[in-house]
Amino acid sequence: PLRVALGDSLMWRKNRFATPRRTRLVEGGDELMAERAANQRPNTELLRQQALAALPGDGRLLIQADGQVKVVSPQVLGRLHIHEPSPLGDEPSPARLILPIEPPPKLLAISAGGRVAAVRWEFAGQQPGSLERFLPTGLEGDPVISIEPLPQGDCSNLSLGLLSSDGRFKRLPLSEVLDLSGRATSVVKLKEGISVRAAMICQTGSDLVLISDIGRILKLPIQDDSLPLMGRLAQGPMTMRLFPGEQLVGGVSLMATTSILIATSQGRIGRIDASLLRRCQRGDFGEMAVRLEQQNDKIQTICKGDGLVGVITSQKRHGRLDANSYPCINPGEPCSDQLDLNTNETLSNLIPLLQDNQN
């Protein structure tokens, strides 16, 4: 048959022209060659260490609200005046974080989709750029809502808190995210249409403050019986039950601060002493944080009430204010101050500045 003839012909050609094998077949040789090639390539951790060693010892890590990541000298930082109060205008984007690079800080980026990843900021010394360049590709298209510095020492009483838009709050042991690889990791299971609204480092025994757009505020103790620690696949318990049309704005973990700053869409600012708020249980009604005097004005954002706070408006104007300069009001009172906004301009966000060893 033709098949037998072709086989005999190929076998004759192999015996006539083929060269004898000069290497020895080794079981698993393909895997060994791949491992050897990988070891010869510089890995990400080695490149990160080399980039860190090339940075000046007195450098400062600067991350702005628009996502720009830079390593600058103290002299350049002083000329920018980005850590000083300023009125609304054509100012640079507010600073979100200013930290010394010695000791090297560990930064955790949390996305709206409930994923976390380490920020490889060390590469910003030679090539500054947008935050996306220093994050794994797994976060591409998933907006980062928070950047949290991880502690250097004991973190047994610390946890990562995630507040979702449906009013659920989940605490994850911080030890589970300290040693992240170069990939993004999912830390919360979200239903369709639900996103992470706020993320924060929580300390056991402190308080959590949540607020909605109508001004309803809820203060919860961060304890295992009220806000238990959960695994990565859990959604977290319901904390604030929302009325029809009511939306959750955000939350603040009160660790080293005792006051909160609240801003409305029309630019009204109120600072409240958090110790005056009563502690509640999950699902409670809570109390009214401020009295909104206009029907179309709603709570836009909340942040800690001390230190420097950046301001961003709908017309892309920027400013910086000193939260400590605002007097504290009692819960339920009108906001004490008004930002100088243009016609048809609204407040978009408040960006608290994290610097040095602030929490």
Write out the residue ranges for each language-model feature.
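Short, structured "edge-of-domain" segments at secondary-structure transitions
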Residues: 1-359
